């Protein structure tokens, strides 16, 4: 399953990176003291709304959303992604190159991970090997809340964006209520389980 392979590869690369840093790097210490221009490129603001500065990374996220929406809805590659996710066998019979589409999807995901790492490093002002660890859980939760199906064939970019907003509002509220980080992990897991259960129920009803 692509998700299992991706998760396993992540753990392998993460472990190798930690060993490399411990043996040949800075003993696992965070990299800080990043150039100010690098941080300002991401955390600075060129536009204010009613006097409130909007960080640049918000606009970068908007650009990515528009790009992905266009690719998903207006290109052949987007249609192929949907077809392969829905039913690889049927997509193959219809003339879609399933292997090529799958590789391109993973390549696109890798590019997005790189962009995210670049932005996150500048946003927090430092970087280390475990920066972004467990972000995949946030991504899964946001997508499932936004209507993306684990079995494929269902999902919209607008739904994912809505899921991100809903998830973020939930965790900001939990922080405001002084809920511990450990309990937030529990709540996040429950959100994913409940959303997946609802998704599977819808799938079984359709079947």
Protein language model features and the residues they cover:
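Transmembrane helix-loop junctions in multipass membrane proteins, especially transporters and channels
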Residues: 22-30, 73, 77, 122-129, ...
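Hydrophobic core segments of alpha-helical transmembrane domains in multi-pass membrane transport
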Residues: 10-18, 60-70, 106-116, 143-149, ...
């Amino acid at each position: 399953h692509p998700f299992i392979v991706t998760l396993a590869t992540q753990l392998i690369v993460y472990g190798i990176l930690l060993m490399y840093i411990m043996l040949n790097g800075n003993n696992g210490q965070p990299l800080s003291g990043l150039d100010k221009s690098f941080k300002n490129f991401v955390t600075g603001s060129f536009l204010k709304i009613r006097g409130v500065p909007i960080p640049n990374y918000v606009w970068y996220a908007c650009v990515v959303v528009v790009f992905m929406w266009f690719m998903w809805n207006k290109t052949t590659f987007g249609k192929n992604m949907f077809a392969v996710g829905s039913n690889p066998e049927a997509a193959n019979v219809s003339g879609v190159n399933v292997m090529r589409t799958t590789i391109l999807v993973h390549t696109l995901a890798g590019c997005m991970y790189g962009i995210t790492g670049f932005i996150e490093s500048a946003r927090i002002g430092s970087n280390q090997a475990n920066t972004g660890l467990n972000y995949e859980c946030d991504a899964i939760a946001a997508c499932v809340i936004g209507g993306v199906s684990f079995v494929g064939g269902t999902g919209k970019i607008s739904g994912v964006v809505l899921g991100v907003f809903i998830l973020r509002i939930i965790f900001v509220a939990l922080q405001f209520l002084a809920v511990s980080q450990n309990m937030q992990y529990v709540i996040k897991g429950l959100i994913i389980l409940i959303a997946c259960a609802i998704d599977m129920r819808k799938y079984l009803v359709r079947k």
